[in-house]
Amino acid sequence: MPIFDLRVVCLGTTAAYLATLLNGSMFTHSEPGKIRWHGLVPAKAMHAAKSRLGRDELVAAFLIDTVTALLESSRVACVSVITADRNLEALAKSLGAQAVREPTPSGLLHALQLGMHTVPPSMGTIIALGDLPCLTPTDVNAFLESADLHDSSFISDSEGTGSTMWARRPASTALPHFGVRSRATHRENGSIEIPGSPRAHRDVDTPTALWDAIRIGVGPATMRALEETTPTLATISGLDPIKAVDETGHQRTYPDYTLIEILAPKIGQRVQIDPGTKHITLAQ
């Protein structure tokens, strides 16, 4: 029986072989008798990621919810985040994941190749993009139950042209493809498409996709980030510094916010407060 738990620490290849010699099996929290999976999550530097969304807080929140879904899956032994961003590296470690440092940003496929070299050959590989805020451990488990049966497999994105997750069994030489037409490329290369829940299909790289993710249901980190960055309507209740009461009756002070096209703010004036830009504008 395994005596170690990989839920907390993801051990490298050498340690994995040592465990095999000591215990007769890889030590992991995965279910007995099934493939043990190593999760990989590529993460762009925050200043380069999701420019169409324009909020670093959301990018980090997406990553947190994605990594957490993998870490809490009963089928995933450990998770590594591949990134050149030191802040995201620290974030990954704070979640209990391992960080694989990308020396310089060289593109998604290069980052994945770097990460795949760290996966012990006796383990399967599951790759999830870092922008899956709706993903849950149940979704991951369901995908891997099917991935157990195929050399390589994948889940397409909501638009039906790309991919959100991909997996290959131990000893497989299959390679992943993400981005435009990756669904077709995966199928052409023999990967099996696995049907998933709307949560597993929904990646987020545009405001429209974010709206759809909110409709489906996002994870707790993304929900908190949205609450902290979504513009709200309020009524000015104090001046110098600006105070305002939101629609729930809570009053807050905004000393470092900039008034936009409001030359002489007045108590009782209706405004929109945007935490993302720290702007206060007249309510429309």
Predicted region positions:
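Short, glycine-/small-residue-rich phosphate/pyrophosphate-handling segment
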Residues: 164-190
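A short, N-terminal amphipathic alpha-helix
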Residues: 59-76
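Conserved donor-nucleotide/metal-binding helix-loop-beta segment in metal-dependent transferases, i.e.
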Residues: 138-158
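Short phosphate-binding loop-to-helix
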Residues: 91-126, 182-185
